[in-house]
Amino acid sequence: MNKVIGLLGPIGSGKTTVAKYLSEKYGFFMVVMGDLVRELARKKGLTPTREVLQAVQKEYVSKYGMDYFAKLVIKRIEESKSEKAVIDGMRRMEDVLVPKNYFKENILILLIDAPAKIRYERISKRIREDTPKTYDEFLEQERREYSIFNLDEVFKLADEKIINDSDLETLYKRVDEILRKYGFL
């Protein structure tokens, strides 16, 4: 049976950094939930801004059900035939509950967080269509996402929380400690 790590957290917290670390160091198969939505937006000929991605996600969820993307993630993991997988960017309650129900005790949900100012500095360095231009824009985007996805409640589903406000070495050490504690390494 697969060992799966699910990553939750606000934008710029370090979810993708952790996912890439697990993929590169330990061979975890990586599924990025946002990339699934970006693929669908591009197939429709749309520029994948944050607003467009939210609209595309909403369209597919209303058409195919709240668990559409979670089931797609499970399918990708199963098709990969990998023993270990990491899911980057779970946003909705179903994104967490459906894989938890499917993988049972073989899934570990980690919340990666950091202070807002640090997260804004991190995302300011990104070259993506959906990156906010100002700190106020960033905070407004975050308020919108917390409201749309009910993130406060989603984040409560985490088994462990990591505050990522230091360097990469500290982050990786903390990730390794937690994964060892749960028998995932």
Model-inferred region functions:
Residues 10:
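P-loop (Walker A) phosphate-binding loop of NTP-binding proteins
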Residues 15:
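Conserved lysine of the Walker
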Residues 18:
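Hydrophobic positions on the alpha1 helix immediately C-terminal to the Walker A/P-loop
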Residues 28-98, 136:
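ATP-dependent small-molecule kinase phosphotransfer cores
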Residues 30, 109, 160-163:
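Short, well-ordered beta-strand core segments
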Residues 67, 128-174:
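Small-molecule kinase domains that catalyze NTP-dependent phosphoryl transfer to phosphate-bearing small molecules
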